[in-house]
């Protein structure tokens, strides 16, 4: 995802690390619908000392901790907060989503994704809405 958005918008380059940090909580929530990935994320949360009474609670704690780090590091929570213009986002998102699905790194994702779903995920990242699919 970060590869395909870095230089896609006129409002400025999104550096690779910043994009990864911004996208990570959303991607974890998307991938956590895969049972194997969910177990792994919950284990990461446990091993880093986070608390939760269930796998889902541990994953939420992990995402919350990443969000807290991002605030400390002054990393925007959304693409909108980064300064991407909504009209430009809407104009380009279908192509960006299609290109992101075709990126070599996407093939190693624990949960398969198609262009329409990638577009939904990017839309969550733009507006800061919950990943519930």
Predicted regions and their residues:
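Short, hydrophobic/aliphatic alpha-helical segments
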Residues: 1-9, 95-101
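Amphipathic alpha-helical segments in well-ordered regions
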Residues: 4, 26-27, 125
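Gly/Pro-rich interdomain helix-loop hinge
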Residues: 8-91, 131-132
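Short, amphipathic C-terminal "tail helix"
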Residues: 88-133
